[in-house]
Regions:
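Serine-dependent protease modules
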Residues: 2-243, 248-252, 259, 278-282, ...
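Conserved amphipathic alpha-helical interaction elements at protein-protein interfaces in regulatory
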Residues: 269-270, 287
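Short strand-turn-strand beta-turns centered on an Asx-Gly dipeptide
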Residues: 70, 270-275
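Conserved catalytic motifs of ABC-family nucleotide-binding domains
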Residues: 264
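Short, positively charged, low-complexity/disordered linker segments
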Residues: 259, 267-268
């Protein structure tokens, strides 16, 4: 489906100063400017009742949402929930009859080289189909310049352009395996999609409770890369571990502190899985529900020590 939105752009500080200047010197009452901003994107119906999956950046802050179906019907939509961290949103339309819904697949079994098709409305051209392959997997948000994001994207060379955001990425069986989300401006053949497994989990929470519950551990960490090890050595810091994830700081009264994690500990395993960088630890935390326990194995001054941390609900942007 194609999604069109309208939002009100608030008055800028420059606009306010100009308005105050006119009112002061001319005695005229000036109404604050309310500029309507229009945008568009794509989405796909995941339930015959009119539940639609799209990107958060398409509908966030929208005062009006209109959904254009493939049969040219235009229906008003309402936003059920938005998660800016993963860029996933859920929109609902009320249709007089059941709507055709897509078949959701799985992204965990994807492999580079698989053939995929991207659907959407790039630059306003509805029902556009482009094809390509899965170029790579697990591209972290930070690599795309999305500092606050927590997504390991699917990379594809299927053409994705502005307006494709929120549209489905489909495999050869017609199953949705990703949601088209991002491009790198000026680059050719670099498109990115949110794995459908993540989108399904986030959308389920948004539909049920309107928000996403995230686990909180309470540490600041850094990957023990060769560059980090060299920098530590120059500062006179000696570690018994040469690989893993260094705990730099443990936040006061956090689950990590209560469990006994300490600055200087090096995380080498989460559960039974060895970890080599901070992204792997972060992903493990992301997959954990608040109140569940995460089993860490840390290297503490040469001794492998198991520490179990009972997570709490995240109330800020800590890890």
């Amino acid at each position: 489906v194609s999604i069109k939105v309208e939002s009100v752009v608030p008055e800028t500080p420059q606009d306010e100063r100009y308005r105050q200047y006119i009112e002061e010197f001319f005695g005229a009452r000036v109404t604050p400017r309310r500029e309507i901003q229009r945008g568009e994107g794509s989405g796909f119906i995941i339930n015959a009742d009119g539940t639609i999956l799209t990107n958060a950046h398409v509908v966030a802050n929208a005062q009006k949402v209109q959904v254009l179906l493939n049969d040219d019907r235009a229906l008003p939509g309402r936003v059920l929930g938005v998660d800016k961290v993963t860029d996933v949103a859920v929109v609902k339309v009320d249709a007089p009859s059941p709507l055709p819904a897509v078949q959701l697949g799985e992204s965990k079994s994807l492999r580079p080289g698989q053939f995929v098709v991207a659907l959407g409305s790039p630059l306003g051209f509805e029902n556009t189909v482009t094809s390509g392959i899965v170029s790579a997997l697990s591209r972290p948000s930070a690599r795309l310049g999305i500092a606050d994001g927590k997504v390991d994207f699917i990379q594809t060379d299927a053409a994705i352009n502005p307006g494709n955001s929120g549209g489905p990425l489909i495999d050869t069986q017609g199953r949705v395996i990703g949601m088209n989300t991002a491009i790198i401006q000026g680059a050719q053949g670099l498109g990115f999609a949110i794995p459908i497994d993540l989108a399904k989990d986030i959308s389920t929470q948004l539909i049920k409770q309107g928000r996403v519950a995230r686990a909180f551990v309470g540490v600041k960490m850094i990957t023990l890369s060769p560059e980090v090890l060299q920098a530590l050595q120059r500062r006179g810091v000696s570690l018994s571990a040469t690989a893993g994830v260094l705990i730099q700081e443990v936040l006061p009264d956090s689950p990590a502190q209560k469990a006994g994690l300490q600055p200087g500990d090096v995380v080498v395993k989460v559960g039974d899985t060895p970890v080599k960088d901070g992204t792997e630890v972060q992903n493990a935390i992301e997959k954990t529900k608040p109140g569940q326990t995460i089993a860490f194995t840390v290297n503490r001054q040469g001794t492998l020590t198991p520490i179990s941390v009972r997570t709490e609900a995240l109330t800020n942007q800590a890890t």
